[in-house]
Amino acid sequence: MSLLAIGINHHTASVDLREKVAFGPDKLANALQQLSQHEAVNGSVILSTCNRTEVYCDVKSGARSKVIDWLSQFHQIGLEELKPSLYVYEEQAAIRHLMRVSCGLDSLVLGEPQILGQVKQAYSDSREQQAVDASLEKLFQKTFSVAKRVRTETDIGGNAVSVAYAACTLAKHIFESLEKSTVLLVGAGETIELVAKHLHANGCSKMIVANRTRERALTLAEQFDAQVISLQDIPNHLAKADIVISSTASPLPIIGKGMVETALKQRRHQPMLLVDIAVPRDVEAQVGELNDAYLYTVDDLQSIIDNNIEQRKVEAIQAEAIVAEESAAFMSWLRSLQAVDSIREYRQSANDIREELLSKALLSLESGGDPEKVLRELSNRLTNKLIHAPTRALQLAAEQGEPAKLTVIRQSLGLDELK
């Protein structure tokens, strides 16, 4: 039993190579079935995302090159192209790597939580194909609990490191409850969609989407039960908004100082947060001069993000310590399992010797042998048989000039305790 992790990721391989080595839904089941039938593999889990492809295996001794060859052949990629970008981890290093990946410590965005869901899905897919053996089952279950511990004991995922999430976090800091806030989203592109998802996840249910094309706005609005308006209608709805988040490709500002000033009067000067994440700006810079209007630009958000990245790096130190501790503990547990097999075999061997000699002694007694003589002969033979293997091990260690091995054997036999 030996744990192996091989793979490529955004650190080691180009996008082109990552695409070639990816296991899409159409390939995954076949790949897992092939690995299950591989003579060198006891169990396997394949993790394949846009940033990494990794194969985790419980393998027989010396199977490293065989699994690499299989990966090369499966994707029909030459080893000369694959190997320079490939990393290989074995035993505790493989355990540690899986735990680091699952905790977001090896991600493009440090501490991102999505990778844990992807690891869980990879494990689930492998279980469906009956590719997960007992060792991998224990490893992945332990990994999930370690990831939970890291999230509980550190704040590695608690600081915004994307513009969309930073905008939402800023809104949460300024307004006590997003559940009571009305948000005007200007634009309907990918960034605004991410903002809407973050807002919705944080309890915001009152959203207005303003966009140049109504069709795109409707697609977004349907996901969150939001109202749709045109860009021209913004002046008529701006006063309703506690929060305005804007990201369009407009070459000119969409929201001007006068428009906001009018809206603030209608709001009786209740504060309004405006987050402009467009380049060039969607909101005139002069809006920031107005009382009760709090304007933040993409540069302000980047400053928050940079600070949060540094905070995540600090939290990552504690997370790495947890992973180091847990991976070492799991490796110790695995080694103890290997010892269990050896102990079982040793006990069985001793029992076989005992039964053999006892049978001979009983036959001697039945034949009228002297009981004392039979018992002495039994004890002598039993002693000689049981000490033969350790005696030979002591002799070999001495003959081969290996004092360290000799010391270990002496300690194992408890000889030093007899002095």
UniProtKB/Swiss-Prot annotation:
Annotated EC: 1.2.1.70
UniProt keyword annotation of NADP present: yes
Pfam family, one: Shikimate_DH
Entries under CDD domains matching the protein: NAD_bind_Glutamyl_tRNA_reduct (cd05213)
Source domain of life: Bacteria
Binding site residues for substrate: 49-52, 107, 112-114, 118
Reactions this protein catalyses: (S)-4-amino-5-oxopentanoate + tRNA(Glu) + NADP(+) = L-glutamyl-tRNA(Glu) + NADPH + H(+)
InterPro entries referenced in this protein's UniProt entry, alphabetically: 4pyrrol_synth_GluRdtase (IPR000343), 4pyrrol_synth_GluRdtase_dimer (IPR015896), 4pyrrol_synth_GluRdtase_N (IPR015895), GluRdtase_CS (IPR018214), GluRdtase_dimer_dom_sf (IPR036453), GluRdtase_N_sf (IPR036343), NAD(P)-bd_dom_sf (IPR036291), Shikm_DH/Glu-tRNA_Rdtase (IPR006151)
Keywords for this protein: NADP, Oxidoreductase, Porphyrin biosynthesis
Presence of the UniProt keyword NADP in the record: yes
Amino acids binding NADP(+): 187-192
Subunit organization: Homodimer.
Family: Belongs to the glutamyl-tRNA reductase family.
PANTHER family membership: GLUTAMYL-TRNA REDUCTASE
Described purpose of this protein according to its UniProt entry: Catalyzes the NADPH-dependent reduction of glutamyl-tRNA(Glu) to glutamate 1-semialdehyde (GSA).
Free-text domain note: Possesses an unusual extended V-shaped dimeric structure with each monomer consisting of three distinct domains arranged along a curved 'spinal' alpha-helix. The N-terminal catalytic domain specifically recognizes the glutamate moiety of the substrate. The second domain is the NADPH-binding domain, and the third C-terminal domain is responsible for dimerization.
Name used for this protein in its record: Glutamyl-tRNA reductase
Lineage: Bacteria, Pseudomonadati, Pseudomonadota, Gammaproteobacteria, Vibrionales
